[in-house]
Amino acid sequence: MTPTLLSAFWTYTLITAMTPGPNNILALSSATSHGFRQSTRVLAGMSLGFLIVMLLCAGISFSLAVIDPAAVHLLSWAGAAYIVWLAWKIATSPTKEDGLQAKPISFWASFALQFVNVKIILYGVTALSTFVLPQTQALSWVVGVSVLLAMIGTFGNVCWALAGHLFQRLFRQYGRQLNIVLALLLVYCAVRIFY
């Protein structure tokens, strides 16, 4: 990979990993509501799911030309529905002011999000088909870059969770407003899947 292509790869992956999306918003919300330690299950579920999705993207990238567009469209609708469900859960979750502390979303729920998270699927397919496959079709490179993509994505999730933890007091003071803003951002993510 040339230095220019490598620079473009790092720019694309880091910007994509750090911008708002379902995972980052969920990580922020979970750490704000429950603290970083209690959110590790959420982060672990996201990380494992992310890795598996990136490995699946490696396989998909090899056969993009034969993928049925209807299947991709159905995946988009499933992803949008799940993201809207997450938005509803965040918007209606109790805040500290409500006197209740709901449990953080489970490992398996955050794991399942990855399989309908269109942002990370497009992230993986785009990175692999743009930066890796034109250079090499060696399976070791494709799998290695898939693992790297999952690590970069996990880094973004942890950064957002740390922000939620560090600003927990402020975010808890304005918990209801924050939950609504985060829910609206998730709805925006769901709408952006189609437009």
Swiss-Prot record:
Annotated GO biological process: cysteine export across plasma membrane
Entry keywords, A to Z: Amino-acid transport, Cell inner membrane, Cell membrane, Membrane, Transmembrane, Transmembrane helix, Transport
Organism whose genome encodes this protein: Escherichia coli (strain K12)
Record-annotated membrane-spanning stretches: 8-28, 47-67, 70-90, 105-125, 142-162, 177-194
UniProt subcellular location: Cell inner membrane
Membrane side Periplasmic: residue ranges: 1-7, 68-69, 126-141, 195
Membrane topology recorded in Swiss-Prot or TrEMBL: Multi-pass membrane protein
Protein name as it appears in the record: Cysteine/O-acetylserine efflux protein
Reaction equation(s) it catalyzes: O-acetyl-L-serine(in) = O-acetyl-L-serine(out); L-cysteine(in) = L-cysteine(out)
A Pfam family per the record: LysE
Gene label: eamB
GO cellular component: a single term: plasma membrane
Single GO molecular function: amino acid transmembrane transporter activity
Role noted for this protein: Exporter of O-acetylserine (OAS) and cysteine.
Cross-referenced NCBIfam families: PRK10323.1
PANTHER family: ARGININE EXPORTER PROTEIN ARGO (PTHR30086), ARGININE EXPORTER PROTEIN ARGO-RELATED (PTHR30086:SF20)
Cytoplasmic side: 29-46, 91-104, 163-176
Family membership noted in the UniProt record: Belongs to the Rht family.
